[in-house]
Amino acid sequence: MWPTRSKALITSAQSFGSWRGLAVCLGVALSLFLPVALHSEGADPAAARVNTLYDALLQVMKQAKQLGLQGRYDKLTPVLAKTYNLPLMSRIAVGQSWDALSAPQKQSIVTAFTRMTTATYANRFDGFSGESLEVLQTVDQSNGDKLVKTRIVQTDGTILALNYLARKTGNDWRVIDVYLNGTISELASRRAEFAAILKSGGPEALIASLNKQGDKLLKGS
């Protein structure tokens, strides 16, 4: 199911965070995110957030063998918590069913989703071969969000466009979705996946599925 390390960056982008399988998102048409203005990545706070993520990923990749899987997980846990609004992403991925869940169920889903996401990064970013992770520009969206455009350049010259949708939370900017090749929404994919599980087994089945995925990734498989 998963590729070798040489393909890890591109597969990671395809699977949230793989970054695993997550173009319309958040229940609105993509047309609502029409660009208003372009910015270079230098002074933009949303771009700075993604730059911090990429700096941390490169550091972990270069130290991957010394850190080991658990060490990579521990290093990336605080970085991903600051980069992504994982509670909001969990709620959006669950969709309309969210309001019917109990508070403990909501917390269990957020915890399991966060763990699975972090485990995915730790599992896949397991070495460095000269890849380049580049933040290009930020595009203001009409609803106040920002789209941070980036690319991943493999050593063989393969280029993957990877865009991050960021939203302001208080005084901070957090990523709420990732778009592969500029259009494929990670959250939209997650929402479809979660809906199928919720329909067949309810919230407890979703929690179990997320925990199972996290367990598998943290075992290195």
Language model segments and positions:
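Early exported N-terminus immediately downstream of N-terminal targeting peptides
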Residues: 43-121
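Surface-exposed, charged secondary-structure patches
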Residues: 118-160, 210-221
